[in-house]
């Protein structure tokens, strides 16, 4: 499951038999930062702060918004967890994969399938599929099996850097050979079940505070056991996700993986440091360094608090309302949404959901006009409902995250783009504007959003539009059209309002 051009597999050496060398499970002690530890007070304070902030954030969200936000956070969690492994699949492409819209490039398609697998597993977890079993040997194996079962064949192979032997990863199978990860030689293959049994024994029956602290400790200790040939990092992060979900009732609306990925060097350094042996008489009583484990727990909990704080800021009602309604007004001016579309979204933001019968009242118009607005917003991907008569709920699409939820994940920029000196196209956001007979799409120059458009005539004459489906013609030739817009922009050939317009007589 590594990048084809940069394979850094876990395996270092092979053993012919899956034997147990009899290592004592005390090798991975301490498994917890105990009550008597000099590090405990500071960590307990962080655990309590995390619990309070998580509860407050969850209470601030209507249940319907909680569900919608959790869907976007799954894509975010998947993006950042895979990014830590060197796999960069933007959430916009992840969202496309969930609609079975895959890249023609084989490697990008494989990464989309990998992302879809991750989201499928997390959705199963968020739905309670692993409740009470996340820390059991069988539960950990099931995470791995479900994830790897959905991976394309090319992502199920790792290569020994010394022998060049290619070894296939079997979904859910415990590691059959010895491995070395950095400077750490993992326990023998036959010993893995014993270590997982001890892991379950310690982490499955903890008080709430210990369970919060244990989420950090267990994250490293599972990586230390290294139960699988590959995929251990993602399994550990999914396990941490479910531990926090169950212990803190997070609602799955924030992701510690985002914090790890944004501080990836520190994350990996802390994990490596936790492999260190006990340093002196002040460093606990286990075989491994208690101080290193405490520092990682501090980092882990601080990242959690940081991510809750970040999501709280994004979801502040007044600010979220302003960003969404600003986007709606822009769409209305472009003719892409009907007038008063903002009334529907504002009502949902205030109430959490909107019964269909109340839509006409919300917009102050006829039922027919209200249905037209609802249809347009649904087609745009920002409204959903569980059925034809069910209440309307908000959706947070990845394509609009940069407008609605800025900073949630990075903009998708073209390779070699220079901020402030280049027009890039971070996310697909195109629509046909009937009254102007143009397809409008958006570029980005640094922090500035640049409106671009191509005429229906240009699409018909040069891009197989044929006056049938202009948006479909645009999407079929999107990269070519974006490159034309980029060249015009860089040459300074702009309209008076700073936009880029592509006409047939220029092509």
Locate the predicted segments by residue.
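Short, charged/polar N-terminal "headpieces" of proteins
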Residues: 420-443
């Amino acid at each position: 499951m590594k990048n084809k051009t940069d394979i850094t597999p876990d395996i270092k050496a092979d053993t012919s038999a899956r034997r147990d060398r009899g290592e004592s499970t005390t090798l991975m002690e301490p498994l917890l930062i105990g009550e008597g530890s000099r590090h405990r007070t500071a960590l307990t304070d962080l655990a309590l702060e995390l619990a309070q902030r998580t509860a407050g954030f969850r209470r601030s969200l209507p249940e319907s918004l909680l569900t919608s936000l959790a869907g976007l956070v799954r894509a975010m969690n998947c993006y950042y967890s895979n990014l830590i492994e060197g796999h960069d699949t933007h959430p916009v492409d992840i969202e496309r994969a969930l609609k079975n819209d895959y890249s023609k490039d084989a490697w990008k398609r494989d990464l989309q399938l990998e992302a879809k697998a991750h989201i499928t597993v997390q959705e199963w977890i968020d739905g309670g599929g692993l409740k009470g079993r996340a820390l059991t040997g069988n539960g950990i194996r099931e995470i791995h099996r479900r994830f790897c079962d959905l991976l394309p064949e090319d992502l199920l192979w790792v290569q020994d850097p010394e022998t060049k032997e290619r070894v296939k990863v079997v979904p859910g199978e415990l590691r059959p050979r010895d491995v070395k990860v950095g400077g750490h030689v993992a326990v023998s293959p036959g010993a893995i079940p014993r270590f997982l049994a001890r892991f379950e024994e310690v982490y499955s029956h903890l008080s709430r505070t210990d369970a919060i602290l244990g989420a950090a400790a267990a994250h490293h200790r599972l990586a230390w056991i290294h139960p699988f040939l590959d995929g251990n990092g993602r399994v550990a992060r999914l396990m941490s996700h479910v531990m926090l979900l169950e212990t803190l009732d997070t609602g799955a609306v924030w992701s510690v993986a985002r914090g790890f990925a944004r501080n990836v060097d520190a994350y990996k350094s802390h994990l490596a440091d936790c492999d260190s042996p006990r340093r002196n008489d002040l460093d606990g009583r286990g075989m491994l360094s208690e101080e290193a484990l405490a520092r990682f727990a501090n980092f882990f909990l601080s990242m959690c608090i940081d991510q809750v704080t970040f999501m709280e800021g994004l979801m502040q009602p007044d600010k979220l309302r302003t960003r969404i309604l600003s986007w709606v007004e822009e769409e209305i001016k472009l003719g892409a949404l009907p007038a008063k579309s903002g009334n529907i979204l504002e009502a949902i933001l205030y109430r959490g959901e909107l019964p269909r019968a109340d839509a006409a009242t919300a917009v102050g118009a006829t039922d027919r006009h209200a249905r037209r607005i609802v249809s347009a917003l649904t087609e745009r991907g920002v409204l959903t409902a569980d059925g034809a008569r069910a209440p309307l709920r908000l959706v947070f699409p990845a394509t609009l995250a940069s407008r609605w939820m800025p900073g949630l994940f990075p903009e998708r920029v073209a390779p070699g783009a220079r901020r402030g000196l280049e027009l890039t196209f971070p996310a697909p956001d195109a629509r046909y504007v009937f009254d102007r007979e143009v397809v409008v799409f958006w570029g980005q120059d640094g922090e500035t959003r640049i409106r671009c458009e191509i005429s229906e005539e240009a699409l018909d004459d040069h891009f197989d539009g044929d006056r049938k489906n202009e948006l479909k013609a645009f999407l079929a030739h999107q990269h070519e059209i974006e490159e034309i817009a980029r060249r015009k922009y860089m040459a300074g050939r702009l309209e008076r309002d700073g936009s880029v317009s592509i006409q047939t007589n220029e092509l």
